[in-house]
């Protein structure tokens, strides 16, 4: 068998999600609607947080950053997937494949850290209310957000050094709808044990590390909520955290299933389904989850609509 290294390989073939033309058209329309809602919903959330002064808090600052990451992440994956669903030649250049993977890894890392920061913010707000303005001052939360993006860039650089050195044999067919490290490791004819271990460690540090921050923060939050004497106070505090917990469960469940299970149990078809959730569906659901569960967001949206109606009559 002739061996090709990454310098001689010019393109990959993405098998995608469907084999038949009818199913491809249905999926194209379905994902086009989801992508449109994702972009409009998240950009709308960013704009709403920007124009409403009541949402100028650390919690909603992190949410605006999360919405930005969701738009970027979805745009990294979905447009290419939509194009492939309507194309017979589902190819992606070698450089394009690795750029897609690196941007995805960087943005996913940032998203995990933002979830952790949002959990810490809820801990500070509910468990340390008197010190909240000091703990989460503007300088502090700006540095936290900058650190989240810097960590994503660092993970990007570390993955560049070991994944791009993979060698490939005759086959260039990726059994996935986008370029991700697990299917590339499967495709490579290099000895990938060390590289897979490094990738798993990096994913584990990011996912498990931020999850520990989330679990410890919410352990204190729930203890404080149940210690409140006022039923109204408990309901308000729990309602504030419910949307964040819902988004966390959806995101981390699919990420853990995809990246932290043993490689021996790796299933291409099951991984595709899980990947659809955290790359396409969850970015659309996040603004819906936060807007439906948050009284502040609903109030801000009502104020914007009210002002627009008033101005239209003038």
From Swiss-Prot:
Transmembrane segments: 26-46, 55-75, 100-120, 140-160, 197-217, 238-258, 272-292
CDD domains referenced in this protein's UniProt entry, alphabetically: 7tmA_OR8H-like
InterPro entries the record matches: GPCR_Rhodpsn (IPR000276), GPCR_Rhodpsn_7TM (IPR017452), Olfact_rcpt (IPR000725)
GO CC terms: membrane; plasma membrane
Keywords: Cell membrane, Disulfide bond, G-protein coupled receptor, Glycoprotein, Membrane, Olfaction, Receptor, Sensory transduction, Transducer, Transmembrane, Transmembrane helix
Bilayer disposition of the protein: Multi-pass membrane protein
GO BP term, example: sensory perception of smell
UniProt subcellular location: Cell membrane
Pfam families: 7tm_4
Glycosylated residues (UniProt): 5
A GO MF term: olfactory receptor activity
Residue ranges, Cytoplasmic side: 47-54, 121-139, 218-237, 293-314
Coiled-coil features, chain-numbered ranges: none
Cystine connections: 97-189
Extracellular side: 1-25, 76-99, 161-196, 259-271
Family, similarity comment: Belongs to the G-protein coupled receptor 1 family.
Protein's job: Odorant receptor.
Stated name of the protein: Olfactory receptor 5F1
